[in-house]
Amino acid sequence: MSLSTLKRDHIKKNLRDTEYDVVIVGGGITGAGIALDASNRGMKVALVEMQDFAQGTSSRSTKLVHGGLRYLKQLQVGVVAETGKERAIVYENGPHVTTPEWMLLPMHKGGTFGKFSTSIGLAMYDRLAGVKKSERKKMLSKQETLNKEPLVKRDGLKGGGYYVEYRTDDARLTIEVMKKAAENGAEILNYTKSEHFTYDSNKKVNGIEVLDMIDGETYAIKAKKVINASGPWVDEVRSGDYARNNKQLRLTKGVHVVIDQSKFPLGQAVYFDTEKDGRMIFAIPREGKAYVGTTDTFYDNEKATPLTTQEDRDYLINAINYMFPTVNVKDEDIESTWAGIRPLILEKGKDPSEISRKDEVWEGESGLLTIAGGKLTGYRHMALEIVDLLAKRLKQEYGLKFESCATKNLKISGGDVGGSKNFEHFVEQKVDAAKGFGIDEDVARRLASKYGSNVDQLFNIAQTAPYHDSKLPLEIYVELVYSIQQEMVYKPTDFLVRRSGKLYFNIQDVLDYKNAVIDVMADMLNYSETQKEAYTEEVEVAIDEARTGNDQPATKA
């Protein structure tokens, strides 16, 4: 199956008429990883997501697939070792969505990291995380540190560490994993909310009843097993089951701000400690912008729409001006923001940054499997753990046998580029090929870098589609049409926020082209006038929330 919005009705019919080995509730990176692993082993898989894919936590991270240097500080050695190895796998299987990025770690007198401890720590990190030779840490003098990033605070500067992180587009990583699962036969649908579990005569879960969030229809999906992978909604989903354990989530909120490089001319990614509380945060250049985050505060409010408060903005502005004192960033320099929720497992008495990011699998008497906690980087290994258990139960209860996990070397959608070492060459080949389609070289390079081995489909759209009638630039038009045909974009915000990332990193494009995008989608997807008005309002709300945030309390009134 493809993830085509134009096939929604067909997918829905299949979901109604088929009994699956497993139905997964949740369409973030965790659910996507499980769908890929299970379908790759030959299981019959369904997945539903009540919003858009990655709309919860998986589009709101720091957008790093990282080895977890901060966990070394907390002596979580096992976490560093596992995430480091997983990071390399994620990169190799999808170099079009993950890119190595050298990170500068400035060391100041009285700061979190001293020269000796940093050198030892980074050496341990390299060893534990299995870092390749070309990417192993370097220790820098004060002058070398300033050469890397002249904006860094000079007062008390002793030197710096230099090590590699991996930058990603979290929402695109999620959709590429999801597309590969669909390619393997998984039946996947967004805007489909799990409302209730269904049970057999032995009180074992045997499916879910769902609500189509677009047309209001309800129907049942039958499955031998159900996996709850709903991130921040894990507790709500399993509250409908009679057999839940006493574990629960503790949500924390993380906020990022985006500033144009004309206001904050950051040339080098920097990982630094704040003056206020010593928390480590990132400042990362991307596409002519610099984004900075994250905060870490307890959160008990609306899960679907966590917002950036003035307190969050002030915290990050103060952090920027402390570490980069000559830039003098002001609140009005912030172009866009995003806020995300971390679904952590409750550990009483701990501060937000102290709570472990580990994942756990919970199995209820009803047979419901729930996966909680975890991180973006570990999605593949998390899937391996729960699908191993799923396979074991399907064998015990139904006599079904499936292959072992084989995702370690499985390319995600768009990842067939000849390996990470060949990726730059692959992109240049595609740039040459694009000349035959009359596509500008810079546009072709951006598309090939972003879509990997799927880029030929976008080139074909460029050749055949009537984009001149759309009032859209060719690049935006082909991405939009492709996202409808292959990435299950149904609402304008799906495209403007998650598939393209424009709301965060090019909000001017959203302001300039939002109406043209809505017109193309209304035409392709036959929106009613009511839908068009509602979705237009959603775009306006998203713009407002990204630009100004809100005075949203951490706890519901």
UniProtKB/Swiss-Prot annotation:
Similarity-based family: Belongs to the FAD-dependent glycerol-3-phosphate dehydrogenase family.
EC number, as in UniProt: 1.1.5.3
Protein source organism: Staphylococcus epidermidis (strain ATCC 35984 / DSM 28319 / BCRC 17069 / CCUG 31568 / BM 3577 / RP62A)
Binding site for FAD: 21-49
Disulfide bonds: none
Entry keyword Oxidoreductase: yes
Major localization class: cytoplasm
GO annotation, biological process: glycerol catabolic process; glycerol-3-phosphate catabolic process
PROSITE patterns, alphabetized: FAD_G3PDH_1, FAD_G3PDH_2
An example molecular function term from Gene Ontology annotations: glycerol-3-phosphate dehydrogenase (quinone) activity
GO cellular component, one term: cytoplasm
Catalytic activity reported: a quinone + sn-glycerol 3-phosphate = dihydroxyacetone phosphate + a quinol
Protein name as it appears in the record: Aerobic glycerol-3-phosphate dehydrogenase
UniProt pathway: Polyol metabolism; glycerol degradation via glycerol kinase pathway; glycerone phosphate from sn-glycerol 3-phosphate (aerobic route): step 1/1
Keywords: Cytoplasm, FAD, Flavoprotein, Glycerol metabolism, Oxidoreductase
